């Protein structure tokens, strides 16, 4: 028991340094192995206790049997007029009856302890089966909880508004690049005067496009909310 407590304290101290339920499958498998080891030891103890109980029972039965023989011998000796021989047989009978009583008491005690051990073993085996039945479900629940926690942490790190604003900024930049490219192409066919002539109109159209783009952005954000 002392060694087991030391081991449990050591295991507990190690687990405190680990992430909580970092690997539930490993922990549950270890728990199952520990229970199986305890059950194996309990079975060995039961075998030994059964042997002890059997030995006491055998000694009790042998002593009682010999005591019975000595009683018969004493009666025969007494009937034959051999009183001293009868006394000797009776003395041995009394001694054997005392030993038989001792062995019987030891047998009953050992047998009672054996029954308790068998009851404890049955309880352990029931618990082990219960753990095995629930193990996979517990592992699945732990994995699901861990995955959900990981996803929540990931989502917390992402600023969705910031990401969306970055998307709009890139979109506007691409639009400006397209406009500059188209403007440059048309400039090759026109003159500087023509560019100045339509500059205000072009700027007005650009402003309309920007306004429309912002309206679309606001509508999209409102729909997402």
Swiss-Prot record:
The keyword Coiled coil applies. Keywords: Coiled coil. Residues 58-151, 161-182 form a coiled coil. InterPro entries: PspA_VIPP1 (IPR007157). The keyword Coiled coil applies. Induction: Induced, via the two-component regulatory system LiaS/LiaR, by antibiotics (vancomycin, bacitracin, nisin and ramoplanin), cationic antimicrobial peptides (human LL-37 and porcine PG-1), Triton X-100 and severe secretion stress. Belongs to the PspA/Vipp/IM30 family. PANTHER family: MEMBRANE-ASSOCIATED PROTEIN VIPP1, CHLOROPLASTIC (PTHR31088), PHAGE SHOCK PROTEIN A (PTHR31088:SF6). This is Protein LiaH. The lineage of its organism: Bacteria, Bacillati, Bacillota, Bacilli, Bacillales.
